């Protein structure tokens, strides 16, 4: 038997923090790609520490629903899963290309395929573009539309910014938008000044966050000038400094993000069959239905 475990941060304060993990788990569960699909969290139950004990499968694919490589993916998750032989160097990553490593969890007698985070997978760029399509209702953009990919940014983890720049570069090479920029909450270039970085009339702003919470629902809209008080709401798009800003909310809530989880497991050797294509078709259908 084979199992998939999606591990997320969770929150004691924001019940929506875990929602993407449950939603994407349900999507993958319906595909039938795995005998078991579980969710586990740092700040909620079921916990990282106990999740492996809930599985009957002897082979487990663990996919972190995190944006970047760093403290949680390199220290907390391996420690809590008791992957004693894990070494971040085994990923041979420069901060954006962690793949997977196979280890034994001896206390539960299971083989664990520990994957890199969803946020640095190549296919996340496609999810960002799809998120932009979902908020604008457009399948094509062209030179009149710019895209701002928003990250948290932090001096404590340089990989946090690397993931944002990585996807901004990839999307720029796709030629989908007239302009593509990476911006941040806590470092330059700052999201507060997003209109300064674009000549396009329309700017789609997509936060590379797993879930919607205080940053995506309160801080970023106010920082960009969409509203003085998030509680009063704002229009989509909102005119700011001569530009129309289309703000999408967290990319991790996009249904297509389930595909990234599945692709991470497939890259680690999970025999998912045609589940990737099935999930892509299902999640794109969800987007179309939402736009009706």
Swiss-Prot record:
<dbReference type="GO" id="GO:0016852">
    <property type="term" value="F:sirohydrochlorin cobaltochelatase activity"/>
</dbReference>
<comment type="similarity">
    <text>Belongs to the CbiX family. CbiXS subfamily.</text>
</comment>
<dbReference type="InterPro" id="IPR002762">
    <property type="entry name" value="CbiX-like"/>
</dbReference>
<keyword id="KW-0456">Lyase</keyword>
<keyword id="KW-0170">Cobalt</keyword>
<keyword id="KW-0677">Repeat</keyword>
<dbReference type="GO" id="GO:0009236">
    <property type="term" value="P:cobalamin biosynthetic process"/>
</dbReference>
<comment type="pathway">
    <text>Cofactor biosynthesis; adenosylcobalamin biosynthesis; cob(II)yrinate a,c-diamide from sirohydrochlorin (anaerobic route): step 1/10.</text>
</comment>
<keyword id="KW-0479">Metal-binding</keyword>
<feature type="binding site">
    <location>
        <position position="215"/>
    </location>
    <ligand>
        <name>Co(2+)</name>
    </ligand>
</feature>
<comment type="function">
    <text>Catalyzes the insertion of Co(2+) into sirohydrochlorin as part of the anaerobic pathway to cobalamin biosynthesis.</text>
</comment>
<feature type="binding site">
    <location>
        <position position="152"/>
    </location>
    <ligand>
        <name>Co(2+)</name>
    </ligand>
</feature>
<keyword id="KW-0169">Cobalamin biosynthesis</keyword>
<dbReference type="InterPro" id="IPR050963">
    <property type="entry name" value="Sirohydro_Cobaltochel/CbiX"/>
</dbReference>
<dbReference type="Pfam" id="PF01903">
    <property type="entry name" value="CbiX"/>
</dbReference>
<protein>
    <recommendedName>
        <fullName>Probable sirohydrochlorin cobaltochelatase</fullName>
        <ecNumber>4.99.1.3</ecNumber>
    </recommendedName>
</protein>
<feature type="region of interest" description="CbiX 2">
    <location>
        <begin position="142"/>
        <end position="292"/>
    </location>
</feature>
<feature type="region of interest" description="CbiX 1">
    <location>
        <begin position="1"/>
        <end position="141"/>
    </location>
</feature>
<dbReference type="GO" id="GO:0046872">
    <property type="term" value="F:metal ion binding"/>
</dbReference>
